[in-house]
Curated annotation (Swiss-Prot):
Pfam families: DD_K, FSAP_sig_propep. Residues 23-43, 74-75 form a propeptide. This is Dermaseptin-A3. It comes from the Eukaryota.
Amino acid sequence: MAFLKKSLFLVLLLGLISLSICEEEKRENEVEEEQEDDEQSELRRSLWSKIKEMAATAGKAALNAVTGMVNQGEQ
């Protein structure tokens, strides 16, 4: 009976250690994924800001071109 208790205790102990290691690895993976998501979000924000800047510049250039054509037409 004592042998069974020791064996059961050993199995439970090893199971807890294994579970603990798996949980730690899972947390590390989640942290890495969050960091990657943060980096991707930052890249998206910078990309959108560049697109907005380009659109604003193109809009201003188009407005200036149209204004120039209208002014030439009036003369």
